[in-house]
């Protein structure tokens, strides 16, 4: 059982330790202390949900319906472009970290945005649902699959909360407007690049 849990834990680690859109959003939320723990909670929940969807064998639906993947990809492109351009605008105009700016984002908006970054990217499904779900087929027993999924979900939770908390602790050091502009610029460029990459992938799916 422990071995199965550890396999899931480290497989998820190999997939999530990348500078993707979801990680950037969690990082930025932590740096601005904008409901960063809520963002981490939503991100962790979505990852766990997708992992268990894959482990329980629902991945075949996503694989067998190309139109679903393409539609999700198109929505994801628009989502990433919107937030990427928003970050570039912040890099140009600046973003002051203050009490007022922390309150500017409502709880509902925070949850919806976190859901968007967690669910509107086909690559997330390919990693969590298809890859992890596919790997879990080596375990014939449903109990083993559960522990495998629990291991993968545990790493996601540790990672997102750790990232949000560390970013929050470092926010005072990076609260200088110039530093925030640089962070926004880097985030914006990466998000736009991810949108372009996703667009190329979507074209290849036709």
Give short role names for the model-derived ranges.
Residues 9, 13, 17, 48, ...:
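Hydrophobic/aromatic residues within the transmembrane alpha-helices of Major Facilitator Superfamily
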Residues 107-128:
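Selected transmembrane alpha-helices and immediately adjacent juxtamembrane segments
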Residues 7-11, 42, 112-117, 151, ...:
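Alpha-helical transmembrane segments of MFS and MFS-like solute carriers/permeases
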Residues 2-70, 129-147:
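Juxtamembrane transmembrane-helix termini in multi-pass membrane transport proteins
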Residues 34-110, 166-169, 186-189, 196:
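Membrane helix-loop-helix hairpins that form the core translocation module of multi-pass transporters
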Residues 196-206:
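Juxtamembrane boundary at the C-terminal end of a transmembrane helix
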């Amino acid at each position: 059982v422990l071995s199965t849990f550890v396999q899931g834990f480290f497989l998820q680690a190999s997939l999530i330790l990348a500078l993707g859109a979801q990680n950037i959003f969690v990082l930025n939320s932590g740096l601005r202390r904008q409901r960063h723990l809520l963002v981490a909670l939503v991100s962790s929940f979505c990852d766990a949900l997708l992992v268990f969807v894959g482990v329980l064998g629902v991945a075949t639906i996503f694989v067998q319906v190309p139109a679903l993947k393409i539609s999700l990809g198109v929505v994801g492109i628009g989502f990433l472009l919107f937030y990427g351009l928003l970050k570039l605008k912040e890099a140009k105009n600046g973003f002051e970290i203050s009490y007022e700016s922390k309150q500017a984002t409502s709880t509902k908006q925070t949850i919806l945005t976190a859901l968007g970054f967690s669910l509107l990217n086909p690559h997330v499904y390919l990693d969590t649902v298809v890859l992890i779900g596919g790997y879990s087929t080596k375990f014939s027993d449903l109990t083993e699959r559960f522990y495998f999924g629990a291991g993968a979900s545990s790493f996601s939770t540790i990672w997102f909360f750790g990232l949000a908390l560390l970013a929050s602790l470092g926010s005072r050091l990076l609260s200088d407007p110039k530093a925030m502009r640089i962070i926004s610029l880097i985030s914006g460029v990466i998000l736009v690049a991810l949108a372009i990459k996703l667009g190329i992938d979507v074209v290849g799916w036709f």
